[in-house]
Amino acid sequence: MPFRSELWTEVKDFKFQDLTYHRAKEQGTVRIAFNRPEVRNAFRPQTVDELFTALEHARTTPDVGVVIITGNGPSPKDGGWAFCSGGDQRIRGKDGYKYENSERGATQKMDLARLGRLHILEVQRLIRFMPKVVMAVVPGWAVGGGHSLHVVCDLTLASEEHAVFKQTDPDVASFDSGYGSAYLAKMVGQKRAREIFFLGRNYSAQEAFDMGMVNAVVPHADLENVALEWAREMNSKSPTAMRMLKYGFNMVDDGLVGQQLFAGEATRLAYGTEEAQEGRDSFLEKRPKNFSKFPWHY
């Protein structure tokens, strides 16, 4: 999946070390890419901080409708490709993943409350609740926490030649009992989801597609072009409709939080009606409200 730099402009508001962040020149799409190919794009706390920052920036940029999450490559060690291989096990402590001295400076005092966090879960929630389409573009390995990350995205495109899906949580005494497993079961069924976690086998892009957890299998060389074409199509849609559709899809699985998000957006839409304006104006003008001209729709 060659990165076609001529199609993108770097977002220079940030100084990321573990990610690259670009915006498409001809559409409202951003590309957030893990940039640790030498370790299969495994994430450390700094990586997750940067990912959250980039996603939040994309969320609050009003002319961006689609967010692509992918992984840079290939690895300088063996030429392999990866989306993300989950948490870097070398820095996992007894209560989570640790910031390294080099990440914050050996002399800088660390806030103890930041230590030992599983804040990749905060990233999952941001992806889930973001009122925009988040698309995983998987050029290679999607493993462990990286597998869960693609699961929580709205769509997944996968490299025909290099994508591998694998859940290693039980092998390293970890488990994602939230979106990474329960939402996966909604996609592929309970039996297949349990197989994926309990056995930890490798699945090709085609096998993942056949199960229902991948939207399209794409030749590796075409992956970025296809992702941009999908993004272009989605960016041409009504932003309000896309937002409400995402929240509607999510609501059945997200309990009262999902209901609140959907209802909040519905309330905001209602504020734009003449009926809502009559309610507001009658209050401000201190007169009796008159909703008689508004029908009880059926």
Regions found by a protein language model. Name each.
Residues 155, 195, 199-201, 207, ...:
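Well-ordered beta-strand positions
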Residues 1-77:
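Conserved CoA-thioester-binding segment of acyl-CoA-metabolizing enzymes
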Residues 78, 158-163, 175, 214-261, ...:
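C-terminal long alpha-helix characteristic of the crotonase
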Residues 1-12, 262, 270, 275, ...:
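Intrinsically disordered, low-complexity segments enriched in small/flexible residues
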